C-alpha cells in the first residue's frame, strides 16, 4: 500500500557498545530552522532530536547539530581515561572539514567504514536496520488501514505521526536490549564490549533509502 504522494525523512540512529540507544535524529523535508518547524517540533516526543533540510538529508549543518545535541552530551559522560570511538561510513557530510574538526575537538577517534562495506560490517546497518524498518512498516500499515484506506486519503502521514512511529519503534527495541547488543557481536566487534576494554564506542551509519534512512 502507498499514498499518491511521498515525503522524505532521514532517521539517524546512534547506539553504543554497551547497548545504549542514544536519542535519534529525524530530518524532515523543509526549510532549515524555519519558525513553523521549530514550533511544531516542540510538540514532538522529547526523547529525540528534530531538524529540517530541503531534501531531508544529513548535511553539514545537520551533522554539526547532531554532534552538539547527541554526541557531545554522551561523550561528556565518559571517564577521563576513556577514548570514545565513532564509527562512520564514508558519506560526504562525515568527511567535511568542519565536522572532522569538531569531532577532534570532542576528543573522539573516528573509524571510517570503506565504501560498499556498510551493509556488511556496520553495527547499526547489520543489526538494527531490519528490526527498525519492520516496526516502522507495521505502524505504517496500521495507519494506512485506519486512516489511508478508510478515509480515502492520498496524503502522506503527518510529520508528527512519523515522529511517534520512530519513538515507538525505538522504545520497542530498547525494551529488547539484546537487539542492540547483538549488533556488536558480528564481524569482530565483540572486543568493544569486552569488560576489560578501556574504550567505549559509538556506532552510526547513513543510508540513502527512500522513506527510511538509518545513520
Can you describe what each PLM-predicted range is?
Residues 1-80:
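Electropositive, glycine- and tryptophan-enriched low-complexity nucleic-acid-binding patches
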Residues 16, 47-49, 55-56, 68-93, ...:
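Acidic, serine/proline-rich intrinsically disordered regulatory segments
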Amino acid at each position: 500500500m502507498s499514498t499518491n504522494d511521498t515525503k522524505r525523512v532521514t532517521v539517524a540512529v546512534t547506539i553504543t557498545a554497551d547497548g545504549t540507544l542514544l536519542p535519534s535524529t529525524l530530518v524532515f523535508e523543509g526549510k532549515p530552522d524555519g519558525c513553523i518547524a521549530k514550533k511544531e517540533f516542540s510538540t514532538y516526543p522529547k526523547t529525540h532530536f528534530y531538524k529540517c533540510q530541503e531534501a531531508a538529508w544529513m548535511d553539514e549543518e545537520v551533522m554539526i547539530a547532531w554532534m552538539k545535541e547527541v554526541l557531545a552530551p554522551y561523550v561528556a559522560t565518559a571517564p577521563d581515561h576513556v577514548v570514545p570511538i565513532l564509527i562512520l561510513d564514508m558519506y560526504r557530510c562525515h568527511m567535511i572539514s568542519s565536522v572532522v574538526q569538531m569531532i577532534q575537538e570532542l576528543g573522539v577517534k573516528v573509524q571510517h567504514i570503506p565504501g560498499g562495506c556498510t551493509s556488511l560490517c556496520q553495527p547499526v546497518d547489520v543489526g538494527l536496520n531490519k528490526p527498525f524498518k519492520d516496526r516502522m512498516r507495521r505502524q505504517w500499515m496500521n495507519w494506512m488501514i485506519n486512516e489511508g484506506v478508510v478515509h480515502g486519503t492520498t496524503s502522506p502521514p503527518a510529520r508528527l505521526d512519523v515522529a511517534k512511529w520512530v519513538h515507538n519503534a525505538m522504545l520497542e527495541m530498547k525494551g529488547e536490549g539484546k537487539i542492540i547488543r547483538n549488533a556488536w557481536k558480528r564481524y569482530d566487534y565483540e572486543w568493544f564490549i569486552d569488560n576489560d576494554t578501556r574504550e567505549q564506542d559509538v556506532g552510526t551509519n547513513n543510508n540513502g533509502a527512500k522513506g527510511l534512512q538509518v545513520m
